[in-house]
């Protein structure tokens, strides 16, 4: 055994003093006891709280196979448990006691790393199943036993995902679970009938609480349910049929990847378990050899590498190059490609899978040995690191004490020696990973055209010398370029940039200058300002923002694609240039041109966001806020790139911006709901209805599927909850108070300013009674307000309103209220007068009031006039034809007016053309960071057409 280093001896002294204060004869006497207690604060704290555990360890030292007794030991403790609070205490204390024994064995090398992983996994499984079974019996006593149509009792099956499923759990870990039951039906033998979905949902909620909730005894495991179908927005539990339907119809590649390690917890219910495995197998393992998964895994790896950069992670042995995740990817690429034919590859555990890969000669024996050795080395290091404080971390420490702990625990003389071996192991893994899965980046060699531009960056060239390099530049442009470079060089000199960063910048700048100066439009002074000096002025702020962050400089240097896209997009839009400068993490989005310029399916935004958020711990609110903002910025960049290149027409641009906003709204509501439910429980009436009893109504451009790049969100919050309902948590509050706080929380999540800015500006002034009204209205109060108190302009706003989040019951109620309100018969002359007065008021406040300018949005003949015409027509004629209220967007409203012969087809087409062309121009003005004001001569034909329609329908 290695001697203890100075930091460990100092730590041991502090620990020994604490043990003396216990007045029990449990001082660490033996050398191995002293070593162990100097390694882990978690072990020390638990033995101080339970000194009898140390006595027990001395009498019955931990053994490799003692996990076989976990169930028996725990059942003895649970025999006298009669309430949920006692259950939680017993589970937590048992968990901590066994973890102390595992940490003890691990430090002494008395069990192998594989045996450690097995013990950690079996401990988790034992605790999960024991908690489930205790709660199942209690729920059956309260609500009856869930049965299928044949009267057969139905169990709750729990699928363990990730390392839990593979039997490779780490010391301090989340557990990823999916809850499943075989068949639908109702409970039998209870005080009242309850359908199986409701029973198992309640059981699942109790189980999560019992395992996850922090108490004075700590927690059992942090439970993550986001890998289930539909993630947080989906049901908590699924029947076999519902699960099968989801994976057959909607299962994604990343879900196949996750399912490789899926394992059903517990040894009971074997028949149902085998049925479930048989059902999932075709989704996970394809019958044919499936090479498409390589690209999918490459994409997932790219997402992880971006996360490492975004979160500033370094020295991360899980996510870094050559880390644990890459070893898992290597094994799973063979499982997903060949597992359908080679049944022996259908294993959840990694190390046995590697041996099968070697046996099938899919990798060389030496490579498999390097992967296995690297995996065991990294997993031991990870467990030692996490056992210090029972913290889920894979980042190497920077302080001397914890480095000394890892050095001793890994059997090295010094930290430097440990790091050398770690780097060797990870480099070997990285080489195999790159060979197998590859890298998507374009690493082409330096082109000869770059070489002459080194002097432009490194030396003070004269104007004439630059013109020799780029003969097509005129003198004025050349002089401006030299000035821009000189100022940038001076600014760089004031920044903290190390030798490595300086070297990367000196290699990057000649490439960038060559590409910019040799552009064919170098002297163009067109409307897009794409001449060289303008492009450089837009790119330079980005370079200044990353000049001390070498990782991003290297990203641009090593990828021709990224450099080309930076120049192209900055040339096209100052808005994009500003976004890249403010948020350099967006550079990652430029790596894959196919991704950048290929529109995402409209219905895919929610799933993309769900995948994006899965990598962030649910309880890390700060990172969740950042992730939402980063996702939005990345998707905005993608949409803008597709807009600029003509891939997306104007109608589709707004569609994508709207669907993106809806995906984010759903994520924000669910995130806020989770935070509130954790604090207060959920409103008790939800046990009698589906959904959350909460809806978000989108007004304005969101309601009309017409969002622009800088649009805010006009939202109204509705609830469906009876009076006198309370939440069911330990800190129970009135349910309507719960919904009010939920809405306030949602507003906070949108408006909180992080390093990535605010998520959206949200305007809630369109709610009943405006700023003086309640932030959340009951559905009944909303109906009453629309019927008895709302102004005409509020009914105009309702034309463009639709539900963007909520359950079916609320959706049906809202549509009924909207339908009844808009179909109310009105006096035509009074309606015309009220609409006209509101329009005049808006023009007075928002119009340009300049004879030589035309405000596309606010001036007569512009977009607002078109919107008011559409709203007037709906309010005027819906009483006669209720089908006119079907749509909330202007284009389809005009289609309806023409279809039902209220408006002439040519007039409807003319208004639609004017509306679409003006919106298109607004999008592009936003990309150029220009206002909505243009020359009075722009859109003159459209202005005249709109004015004629206005006069016809709303003129005096």
Swiss-Prot record:
Pfam families according to UniProt: GlnD_UR_UTase, GlnE
SUPFAM superfamilies hit by this protein: Nucleotidyltransferase (SSF81301), Nucleotidyltransferase substrate binding subunit/domain (SSF81593)
InterPro entries the UniProt entry points to: GlnE, GlnE_rpt_dom, NT_sf, PII_UdlTrfase/GS_AdlTrfase
GO BP terms, alphabetized: regulation of glutamine family amino acid metabolic process
Class of the enzyme per the UniProt entry, highest EC level: transferase
Sequence segments annotated as region (Adenylyl removase): 1-441
Any one GO MF annotation of this record: magnesium ion binding
Co-factor(s): Mg(2+)
UniProt-annotated stretches for the region Adenylyl transferase: 450-956
E.C. code: 2.7.7.89, 2.7.7.42
Keyword list, A-Z: ATP-binding, Magnesium, Multifunctional enzyme, Nucleotide-binding, Nucleotidyltransferase, Transferase
Catalytic activity: [glutamine synthetase]-O(4)-(5'-adenylyl)-L-tyrosine + phosphate = [glutamine synthetase]-L-tyrosine + ADP; [glutamine synthetase]-L-tyrosine + ATP = [glutamine synthetase]-O(4)-(5'-adenylyl)-L-tyrosine + diphosphate
GO cellular component, one term: cytosol
Protein task: Involved in the regulation of glutamine synthetase GlnA, a key enzyme in the process to assimilate ammonia. When cellular nitrogen levels are high, the C-terminal adenylyl transferase (AT) inactivates GlnA by covalent transfer of an adenylyl group from ATP to specific tyrosine residue of GlnA, thus reducing its activity. Conversely, when nitrogen levels are low, the N-terminal adenylyl removase (AR) activates GlnA by removing the adenylyl group by phosphorolysis, increasing its activity.
Similarity comment: family membership: Belongs to the GlnE family.
Protein name per the record: Bifunctional glutamine synthetase adenylyltransferase/adenylyl-removing enzyme
